[in-house]
Regions:
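An N-cap/entry alpha-helix motif that binds or orients negatively charged groups
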Residues: 1-59, 63
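A glycine-rich helix N-cap at a beta->alpha junction
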Residues: 120-139
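Hydrophobic faces of well-ordered beta-strands that scaffold small-molecule active sites
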Residues: 67-70, 95-100, 127-131, 150, ...
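Non-catalytic positions within long, well-ordered alpha-helices that form the structural scaffold/packing
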Residues: 91, 144-145, 207, 281
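Short, acidic/polar
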Residues: 79-87, 135-145, 198-201, 273-274
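Glycine-rich phosphate/ribose-binding loops and adjacent secondary-structure elements
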Residues: 172-307
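Active-site beta-loop-alpha junctions enriched in small/polar residues
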Residues: 72-74, 102-104, 130-134, 155-159, ...
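Active-site cofactor/substrate anionic-group-binding motifs, chiefly glycine-
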Residues: 58-105
Length: 308
């Protein structure tokens, strides 16, 4: 029989702990920059709702609606059930869905089922695989193949890694690694933050790596610094809670003014309701994602509540 993998067990426990903390800490009395944005009301709209076309193009694919369920979790029994319910809801609603980091399944193939369930529950959905920039290109290829993904997310989480006791400390070659992954996989690559935002400078640097789009994933939603700090015995990084740029600020910096960045920009991070979705679209996002809101709804209201 296969010997036990202590590191794999630790990663699995961390996955489940992240899930519990993400639900408990979600939206902890945090102000939202979206509330600083208001629309001008026009009393003569001049259009009927049936004439509104909400479709968009992301990574060369047409989406009926500019919305997606963003990356969260996977790789354990508990998180597999979450992924199954999220994917089922995505299939019912006809929206795209991204899985959480697949590192655990790439190291331990027995955990791959927690991710494959997404494609099984959403066979016709646009599905995004998910890896970090530290993986070898061949591992990224395996991640895409694992769930028959239509695109690959590469998540950037330097702030989280620094607070995580077992996290990475060397980020010098991330851009080069992203370029190598983008060249190796045969699907479009979307580089995303995990909740701290992408600056214009970062997006400009990513333009040179060959990726197809970015997801600014700004501050205001799930805060992985707060989550990792809760895992520390002394909770000694609480002063960093709230770090990063808001999604609204990221969009304004990237797309406002006369010279928008050269990559398509997706938006996520702190998206609470349909009005926030429209606000992000008005700021230029090609599509808008949410994760924490759906996770909390699933935990509190079950799969039926999520579908509603």
């Amino acid at each position: 029989s296969r010997p036990a993998d202590p590191a794999g067990s630790e990663r699995a426990a961390r996955k489940d702990e992240h899930l519990e903390l993400a639900v408990r800490l979600h939206g902890a009395d945090r102000p939202s920059a979206f509330d600083d944005l208001a629309f001008v009301h026009h009393a003569l709209p001049g259009i009927g709702t049936e004439a509104v076309d909400m479709s968009t193009t992301v990574c060369g694919a047409r989406w009926d609606v500019p919305f997606y369920i963003n990356a969260m979790t996977g790789g354990t029994r508990a998180t597999a059930a979450v992924n199954a319910d999220l994917a089922g809801a995505a299939a019912d609603a006809g929206v795209a869905i991204a899985c959480g980091s697949q590192h655990i399944a790439l190291r331990d193939p027995e955990r791959a089922e927690g991710f494959r369930v997404i494609r099984r529950e959403a066979p016709r959905a646009f599905v995004l695989a998910n890896v970090g920039p530290t993986l070898a290109p061949e591992q990224a290829v395996r991640a895409v193949e694992m769930i028959e993904a239509d695109a690959l997310q590469i998540h950037l989480n330097a702030a989280q890694e620094l607070v995580m006791p077992e996290g990475d400390r060397d980020f010098r070659d991330w851009a080069e690694r992203i370029a190598a992954i983008a060249a190796a996989v045969d699907v479009p690559v979307v580089v995303k933050e995990v909740g701290f935002g992408l600056s214009r400078r970062t997006i400009t640097a990513l333009e040179r790596t060959g990726v197809g789009a970015v997801d600014v994933a700004g501050a205001g939603g799930t805060d992985f610094i707060a989550i990792e700090n809760e895992r520390r015995p002394r909770r000694d990084y609480s002063y960093l809670t709230g770090w990063g740029q808001s999604t609204a600020l990221c969009l304004l910096e990237a797309l406002g003014g006369e010279e928008p960045v050269g990559l398509p920009v997706l938006a996520s991070g702190g998206v609470r309701n349909p009005l926030d979705v429209v606000r992000a679209l008005a700021l230029g996002a090609s599509a808008v994602g949410a994760s924490g809101h759906f996770l909390r709804t699933l935990v509190h209201d079950g799969a039926d509540g999520l579908r509603r």
